[in-house]
Design a protein with these regions (language model features):
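Membrane-embedded alpha-helical transmembrane segments of multi-pass integral membrane proteins
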Residues: 19-22, 71, 184-187, 213, ...
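Short alpha-helical transmembrane segments in multi-pass integral membrane proteins
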Residues: 2-59, 115-180, 221-234
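Helix-terminus/linker motif at the lipid-water interface of multi-pass membrane proteins
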Residues: 1-3, 66-95, 99, 117, ...
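Small-residue-rich hydrophobic transmembrane alpha-helices
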Residues: 76, 89-147, 151, 184-198, ...
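Hydrophobic faces of transmembrane alpha-helices in multi-pass small-molecule transporters and flippases
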Residues: 22-25, 43-74, 99, 103, ...
Length: 234
């Protein structure tokens, strides 16, 4: 039977559960020496002295992620006032833009681990070198994405939209968000590096303030006559 939207939801949950099951299975069955998690007791009590550091590092990031979702919902509500085509462009546009932020997120995760490892070993020169190399790579990648979005918005949009209204909105979206791709990539990478140093509180404060500023800025630009494009610029 056709499950439509419910089918997509079921498929997503099923896939996530299977990935989780495979990972847990491999953790407890892999005999590799590097598998330090094999003897892990997930439900055993651990020393109280670890609570403070776990809370100090993890809580700011958790709050940041939660507030980011809430802010995104508010912005989506604002976009919905401009019709179904605007919502579709926001959704698909975010997926198109993922070629930039997903890459940056991968570098951030790698740099997080690299920075933490070398910070613990007091190899500060390696931290600076790793950041410098990552900065160069992501700057080039971000500029390539910027050029593609700004110079080729219509061909890219045409891969996903065919009706004139959605196509026009998508072209504007790609041009506007295209200008920030390099900056966004470097931002995500830097957050990864600082988090590796244990500075998650600083990252979260900056991110929450600036991300939260999107809402009043979007309202201001929208009512200033920019319409939907005001939300994209925000």
């Amino acid at each position: 039977p056709r499950l439509e939207t419910a089918g997509a939801a079921i498929a997503t949950v099923t896939a996530q559960f299977l990935v989780f099951a495979v990972l847990v299975f491999r953790i407890f069955t892999s005999g590799l020496e590097t598998n330090v998690l094999r003897e892990l007791h997930l439900f055993s009590r651990f020393p109280r002295k670890f609570y403070k550091n776990i809370f100090r590092i993890g809580f700011p990031t958790a709050i940041q992620s939660m507030l980011y979702c809430m802010i995104s919902m508010v912005l989506t509500r604002m976009v919905s006032a401009f019709g179904a085509a605007a919502i579709a462009v926001q959704r698909v546009g975010g997926q198109i833009e993922s070629v930039s932020w997903n890459t940056a997120d991968g570098f951030a995760s790698a740099l997080n681990a690299f920075t933490a490892q070398n910070f613990g070993a007091k190899k500060y020169d390696r931290i600076r070198q790793g950041y410098r190399i990552s900065f160069g790579i992501l700057t080039i990648w971000g500029l390539i994405i910027t050029a593609a979005f700004v110079l080729l918005p219509r061909p890219i949009s045409g891969l996903f939209f065919h009706d004139p209204e959605s196509l026009g909105i998508s072209v504007n979206y790609l041009i506007i968000i295209g200008f920030c791709e390099a900056f966004m990539a470097i931002e995500l990478m830097t957050i990864g590096a600082l988090s590796g140093l244990g500075m998650t509180k600083l990252c979260s404060i900056i991110s929450i303030i600036l991300t939260g500023a999107r809402i009043p800025l979007a309202m201001l630009l929208t009512h200033a006559g920019m319409g939907l494009n005001g939300i994209w610029w925000a």
